């Protein structure tokens, strides 16, 4: 079950490969995610020193968060992947045009996981084409319903 989805990712990028990564979170972040207080639309993934980090995601702290900590809603969060997967991703991202984007947060075995995708950015005409296809599918479904 998905906690947060990045709906714009499929519109802005051609998704080529998907990976499931663990997230290093603090306790207040897990509680906030359970309450649905997160956003990954502006998030992106970077590779630094053979480690993968999630930057730009916003997790709003709950109002009843502890007073002895100072929550940072947009802090950099480390992603956990196997070393072989990281090496493969480093090789792909170094190729021109590839990037890593977060797709969603979900639970697996009581832990919060992040689906990330190896993707290529879409050009403007690709986005328009995707929108035309979606509109045509919607219109086709409407015609089929009206016909029966």
Swiss-Prot record:
GO terms for cellular component: cytosol. Residues 129-142 have a biased composition (Basic and acidic residues). One of its GO terms (biological process) is trans-translation. Gene3D superfamilies: 2.40.280.10. It is found in: Cytoplasm. The lineage of its organism: Bacteria, Pseudomonadati, Pseudomonadota, Betaproteobacteria, Burkholderiales. Required for rescue of stalled ribosomes mediated by trans-translation. Binds to transfer-messenger RNA (tmRNA), required for stable association of tmRNA with ribosomes. tmRNA and SmpB together mimic tRNA shape, replacing the anticodon stem-loop with SmpB. tmRNA is encoded by the ssrA gene; the 2 termini fold to resemble tRNA(Ala) and it encodes a 'tag peptide', a short internal open reading frame. During trans-translation Ala-aminoacylated tmRNA acts like a tRNA, entering the A-site of stalled ribosomes, displacing the stalled mRNA. It comes from the Bacteria. InterPro entries: SmpB (IPR023620), SsrA-bd_prot (IPR000037), SsrA-bd_prot_CS (IPR020081). Keywords: Cytoplasm, RNA-binding. Belongs to the SmpB family. Residues 129-148 are annotated as: Disordered. GO terms for molecular function: RNA binding. Its main location: cytoplasm. It holds the Pfam family SmpB. This is SsrA-binding protein.
């Amino acid at each position: 079950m998905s906690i947060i989805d990045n709906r714009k990712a499929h519109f802005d990028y051609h998704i080529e490969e998907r990976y499931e990564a663990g997230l290093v979170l603090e306790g207040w972040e897990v509680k906030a995610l359970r309450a649905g207080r997160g956003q990954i639309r502006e998030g992106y993934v970077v590779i630094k020193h053979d480690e993968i980090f999630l930057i730009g995601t916003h997790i709003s702290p709950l109002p009843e968060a502890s007073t002895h900590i100072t929550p940072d809603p947009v802090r950099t969060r480390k992603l956990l992947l196997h070393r072989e997967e990281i090496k493969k991703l480093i090789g792909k991202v170094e190729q021109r045009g590839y990037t890593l984007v977060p797709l969603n947060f979900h639970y697996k075995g009581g832990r919060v996981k992040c689906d990330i995708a190896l993707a290529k950015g879409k050009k403007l005409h690709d986005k328009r084409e995707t929108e035309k296809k979606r509109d045509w599918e919607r219109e086709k479904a409407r015609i089929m319903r009206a016909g029966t």
